[in-house]
Amino acid sequence: MNEILYHGSARKIEKPKFGSGKPNNDYGSGFYCTKDFDLAGEWAVNLDNDGYVNEYTLDTDGLHILNLNSSEYCILDWLRILLENRRFDIQSDFGSEAIRYLRDNFSFDYRSFDVIKGYRADDSYFSFAQDFLNNTISIRTLEKALLLGNLGDQVVLISKRAFERIIFKDYYRVSSARYYPSKEMRDTKARDEYRDLRRKPWSKGEIYLMQIIDREMKRDDLFV
């Protein structure tokens, strides 16, 4: 099965190179794509510079694909991977213990997969995750927050095998004048909606990370 993917960049990339990605991206080193052209356009530009949306097809037949949004996994699996690759601003002793607990209890060999599909931790999503780690929001609020802004899933090639299956099709120059405002608007909208979400009154049954640790809760205790 072939999937059409887009990658936003400052340049045209005809041959993605295995091993050249930044190790501190969400899921580690890899080639980060989306199925949404406009999202790729937003990723490609900054305030002062235009960019390129590169179009590819990926033959997924036989590839080992990790879909973090499938029922087999949970939001803490996504967060656990982020903890391995991104640097969080932890403001308390509790936050450090939270990281240790998630690393010890929600680990799995995600690097054995060829492709990872899941949320993209842009600036707003990343701040939501930090709030959860600092015990500021519940796990239910985190799940709702990650649907704000309509960022969709990113598709990340992480194995050499996956890189051998991607084929360049075309590229499109995209303007900062068009895509940077929509990029800013999407982030602002997500943050505004998050503030509205935070203003809602506390509900009985909400589970915070401190409770998860105190009760030594695991995946099966939280997601049934």
Indicate residue ranges for each PLM-predicted region:
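Extended catalytic/binding region for NAD+/ADP-ribose chemistry, centered on the ART fold
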Residues: 22-47
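Conserved NAD+-utilizing ADP-ribose enzyme module
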Residues: 47-49, 60-224
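Short, flexible loop/turn elements at secondary-structure junctions
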Residues: 10-12, 37, 60-62
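Short, surface-exposed beta-edge/turn micro-motifs
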Residues: 2-3, 28-30, 50-51
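ADP-ribose/NAD+-binding catalytic cleft of ART/PARP-like enzymes
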Residues: 1-26, 224
